[in-house]
Amino acid sequence: MSTRLIIPANFSYDDPLPFTCNQDSHVMLSILEYLVQATYLSVSAVLNSMIVYTIFRCKGKHSYRRNPFFVLYAAEAVMNVYSCVIEVLFGRLIIYMTPLCPALSPFFFTPSILTKLYFLLNHYCLAFKTLSQIAISFNRMTCVIFPVHHFKLWQNILAPVLVSLFVLPLGVTWNILVSRVYVNPNGAGFSVNYRDAVAWANISFLHLFHCIPCLFLMIVFFLASIFGLTMLENRLRSAERSLIIFTMTLGVETMLFAIAQIYFAFLAGYLPGIRPLMLLISFNVFDVLYVYSPIALILMNRQLRRDIFHLKGDDPGFGFTKFPVILVEMISDSSPHLLIINLQLV
């Protein structure tokens, strides 16, 4: 068998696609790379699990579950937990634990439900996270632009937004369902790929239906948020710098993924020289997002940090008092009456 996977021009869905694993001259380095990635992905999964548990554990009039921002974040966090866990247990394992390649790869030379589900759910989660960043950015923009009506607005649109987040990513995965998913050599390990059954509906092209609106809307929402903040007095504006950095970082990371998908859909044949860079961005941008988002949210939100780690603080009970005022509004989505109370407490 060849160390390169050669796909015949005409092959049936059930035909085996065998290959021989490449020799790894740096086995320990590959294993170390896996352990490093498994460590930070595991940390992300644990932190996101703790955030989701805290969001749904707390009850009361001003619980996290009444907060549209936290509900949106919890939906994305569930996807992040799944993505991190499956990458640690399968995706990164088969790439970097190179001694396993000769033993494991033959199980996937023929069609496998495991690789099909892995590949399908991976792209479902990518599409979900692209859309969720649009929703979260819109949520934060409305906090600044419509602070008084923001909470009522999201009471009306939260359910349709959540349904859309879970339904729309199916538009990316339908071609995978009818396509042949296979494994191919990746360095001295192997990874999962597919041969599209519908040629025009490749994955990068289908992702564009989310990525292009994402690029446009994220820019619009960010500029609108900046404009809204400039209308605030200096004291409140300075209190929002950390949140703007947080929002901007999430947006930039998601837009990098969108740019990479646009490249693979339209520009790969014209700019082959930057293909390695685009592959690097596609593979790593969400790793940064997985780790950054829970850590930044926990560090930024003092009350959430206390509830997660059961820390004692000066603030009694469950609430968001003594926070920077717009940070309270953007993170807690409190009612206008609670906003006035918080303004008095600051």
Swiss-Prot record:
TM region(s), chain numbering: 27-47, 69-89, 106-128, 157-177, 212-232, 254-274, 279-299
Compartment list: Membrane
Biological process according to GO: sensory perception of chemical stimulus
Main location, first listed in the record: membrane
Molecular function in Gene Ontology: transmembrane signaling receptor activity
One of the record's GO cellular component terms: membrane
InterPro entries reported for this sequence: 7TM_GPCR_serpentine_rcpt_Srg, Nematode_SR-like
A Pfam entry, by short name: Srg
Keywords from the UniProt entry: Membrane, Transmembrane, Transmembrane helix
Membrane topology: Multi-pass membrane protein
UniProt keyword Cytoplasm present: no
Family per record: Belongs to the nematode receptor-like protein srg family.
Protein name: Serpentine receptor class gamma-20
Taxonomic lineage of the native organism: Eukaryota, Metazoa, Ecdysozoa, Nematoda, Chromadorea
